[in-house]
Amino acid sequence: MPETIIYISFFTSKSPYEKVMNTYLRPSLERWNLIHDIQAIKDLGNWQKNTSYKAQFVLDMLLKHKKTVVFIDADATIEKHPSLFWEIPEEYDIAVHYQDWYKQWRNDNCGKRFDLLSGTIMFRYNEKTLSLVRKWVERTKTFTIWEQKVLQKITEENKDIKIFKLPVEYCTVNNHKGEIPNYIKPEEVYIRHHQASRKFRNRRNWK
């Protein structure tokens, strides 16, 4: 039988993100009959703190389910059945996409910068991964930088973590026009991130 994989996500309660979840990710998970665990969390006060909670949430879900989990942001849609997650060899601890920043935002193929994106990320349930995520939790409590930058730094420090690099089609981020970047074929996209945070990061837009 195929491995059981739990798809996880959260949203801030009493905020526009509840509607975002119910418009984007939740219907996608149901469409593809993917086992999922979605939780509402209390507002921690600002966008930085709410997004940094991702690390604690992933740890809680790993300990709760004791199975491989795939975290996907609330404003993502699953365009095609994400079969790759079942095909990744067991030896890999996490699976994540590294965005070619210059290609995404400057249409430049210089390949000078690659950023870990935590919008779509798979975690195996094992001791190495649990240790990594616990470090992620602790660092996000003291660092003021974006949680995915914290995770990138930790993975670079922990060479024993085996990382599977997801293709861009599993973490396709809309450009500033709200469109799929022209270097990606729309029909090949599996998971698309619609970037609702661009609007709702500013709380004046919550009304």
Predicted segments, located by residue:
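Short, solvent-exposed loop/turn segments at secondary-structure junctions
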Residues: 12-13, 43-44, 76-77, 100-103, ...
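Catalytic core and acceptor-binding pocket of nucleotide-sugar-dependent glycosyltransferases
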Residues: 123-207
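Short amphipathic alpha-helical segments and helix-helix/interface helices
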Residues: 26, 58-59, 82-86, 148-155, ...
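ER/Golgi luminal nucleotide-sugar-dependent glycosyltransferases, focusing on the catalytic module
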Residues: 47, 97, 111-116, 188-196
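GT-A fold catalytic core of metal-dependent nucleotide-sugar glycosyltransferases
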Residues: 52-106, 110-115, 120-127
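N-terminal anchoring/stem segment of glycosyltransferases
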Residues: 1-68, 127, 158-159, 194-200, ...
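Conserved beta-strand scaffold positions in the cores of enzyme catalytic domains, especially
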Residues: 36-39, 69, 94, 163-165, ...
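Short, solvent-exposed polar/charged micro-motifs at secondary-structure junctions
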Residues: 47-50, 105-109, 172-181
